[in-house]
């Protein structure tokens, strides 16, 4: 009987093939932060297409100009005109894109998701406080390292808390063909999603933000070296002012043409 049941004799073959276990890469994939974005806008701030303002986000390199830049507003950058609102048409000011930088007399502004607390911040009566260490805002000449005196106020006419403009106003016009940096800390506000990603050193899905990651890191370092508290930074951006040639060049050309016709 046992001869008829060979399996009972323990003669089955043993598989001694080596089992190979593949190692799994457990390295976490880099986090990419999703940012609200619109083509033609500065996606550092989702509240308004042109904020913060003015900004290098709307400059492109151009080696034919004095500054090496050219203003680059898209067709949808400016808001819809009140008179053309029914047609949904944006304001078009093509001549601005001929400039080689931002106006030295421009308003400097941004907005946050709630109204900032300006307690202790320089106003029109305490402008000197804006130059003190620890002040919540800084306007810095990035070429000389000099702070620019200013005061801060919100738009008193605003009726939308999330759209309230914060103005940084200067006593004198800025220097032409010069890089400036702005920093805002504290104020009981929160950074935008994009700017928080910059602070955290994270990649975003917004190309215009990614194009400025290095320059913004350098800016944060510069305002920190100037004595600004960057541990509670809520917004920072930079811009380059236009050259005098770009600002008054058209007027000089008109004058020359008029004199030639006399």
Functional labels for PLM-detected ranges:
Residues 22-262:
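Acidic, low-complexity Ser/Thr/Gly/Pro-rich repeat segments typical of extracellular/periplasmic
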Residues 12-24:
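Intrinsically disordered, low-complexity repeat and linker tracts
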Residues 1-14:
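Secretory targeting signatures
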């Amino acid at each position: 009987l046992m001869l008829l049941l060979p399996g009972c004799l323990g003669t089955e073959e043993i598989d001694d093939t080596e089992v190979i276990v593949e190692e799994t890469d457990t390295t976490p994939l880099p986090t990419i932060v999703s940012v609200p974005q619109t083509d033609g806008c500065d996606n550092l701030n989702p509240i308004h297409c042109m904020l913060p303002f003015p900004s290098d986000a709307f400059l492109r390199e151009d080696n034919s100009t004095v500054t090496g830049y050219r203003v680059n507003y898209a067709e949808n950058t400016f808001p819809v005109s009140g008179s053309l609102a029914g047609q949904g048409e944006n304001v078009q000011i093509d001549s601005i894109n001929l400039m080689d930088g931002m106006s030295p007399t421009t308003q400097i502004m941004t907005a946050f998701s709630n109204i900032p607390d300006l307690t202790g911040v320089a106003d029109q009566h305490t402008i000197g406080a804006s130059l003190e260490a620890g002040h919540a805002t800084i306007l810095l000449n990035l070429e000389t390292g000099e702070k620019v005196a200013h005061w801060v106020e919100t738009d008193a006419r605003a009726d939308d808390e999330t759209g309230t403009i914060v103005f940084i106003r200067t006593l004198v016009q800025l220097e032409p063909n010069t890089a400036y940096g702005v920093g805002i800390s504290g104020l009981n506000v929160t950074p935008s999603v994009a700017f928080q990603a910059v602070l955290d050193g994270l990649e975003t899905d917004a190309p215009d933000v990614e194009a400025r990651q290095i320059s913004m890191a350098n800016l944060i370092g510069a305002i920190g070296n100037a004595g600004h508290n960057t541990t509670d930074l809520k917004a920072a951006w930079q811009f380059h002012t236009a050259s005098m040639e770009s600002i008054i060049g058209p007027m000089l050309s008109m004058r020359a043409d008029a004199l030639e016709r006399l």
